[in-house]
């Protein structure tokens, strides 16, 4: 048994999800017990700095170093907070904060930058830390994303049921899980980024509310609006949605520039109508991605990430998915908000065991390898 802390902050830049888990077994026989979970919000000033950098604001190398360390300090604090009152963890798996992601193009390797240096976290906490999970996959020609499908296969795969796991963070990504009796090695597991998750909605709400809100709780504001179907169809013509997997994306593509385009296209729409239309666009982008690229229609879909709390978005997904059961991962015993942090605890654990964390058919990497770099803590 190993006690591991998982740390995650996604493209929504809401804060740091921290989980403390006990792990047994390897991959297919993996067992997880969650001991504690918390979300530690970023201080407002730090969140704003991160969003500015993600929005392509220039900064000096000294400013970059300072931001890297400030994020690492926040992650270290989250690790210390989640294990308070529990025996000392053996290991930390820290995803860090993505501030730039560029998929590979042609012969050029991809590039993905996560701030929140692992050496700082190891020094601050005294615990061995695994971080920089995406680099090894990228070095082997992969996208460096998504990295969660192997974890999904182990935790949420089913003997006879074909399933999809849809994460709705800032960006949406899906894992396709074939029935394990028919595919015991998981060779048919697929995964890719479906497009925007909460990102466009959050940008819209922030601007439309004059920064009084940073998101639309439960989709309440959007629910009051009327959907513009022509705009949804227009936005769905973007080339990303027709690009076959493996594929990944980020704030560079579906962040501020895309939002500005949507806002211009929606000139004259009332705020609630624009939010309703963006919600429909997000739901349709997910469902159309399934229709284009899934080898088989699933029998059940599990939602996770912040978007799983948006009941209006869930309703729009259900409208387009018909009678297909759509649940959250909580129905399978995995808390919606903790799932991604659990995944990076597991990837760190697999690193220690020498087990691969990526799936080449998902990321496009040449082979499966253990993920992350290791910084030794003080015993």
UniProtKB/Swiss-Prot annotation:
The keyword Kinase applies. Its EC number is 2.7.1.170. It catalyses: 1,6-anhydro-N-acetyl-beta-muramate + ATP + H2O = N-acetyl-D-muramate 6-phosphate + ADP + H(+). One of its GO terms (molecular function) is phosphotransferase activity, alcohol group as acceptor. This is Anhydro-N-acetylmuramic acid kinase. The keyword Cytoplasm does not apply. It holds the Pfam family AnmK. Catalyzes the specific phosphorylation of 1,6-anhydro-N-acetylmuramic acid (anhMurNAc) with the simultaneous cleavage of the 1,6-anhydro ring, generating MurNAc-6-P. Is required for the utilization of anhMurNAc either imported from the medium or derived from its own cell wall murein, and thus plays a role in cell wall recycling. Keywords: ATP-binding, Carbohydrate metabolism, Kinase, Nucleotide-binding, Transferase. GO terms for biological process: 1,6-anhydro-N-acetyl-beta-muramic acid catabolic process; amino sugar metabolic process; peptidoglycan turnover. The gene is anmK. It comes from Thermosynechococcus vestitus (strain NIES-2133 / IAM M-273 / BP-1). Belongs to the anhydro-N-acetylmuramic acid kinase family. Signal peptide: none annotated. Pathway: Amino-sugar metabolism; 1,6-anhydro-N-acetylmuramate degradation; Cell wall biogenesis; peptidoglycan recycling. ATP binds at residues 10-17.
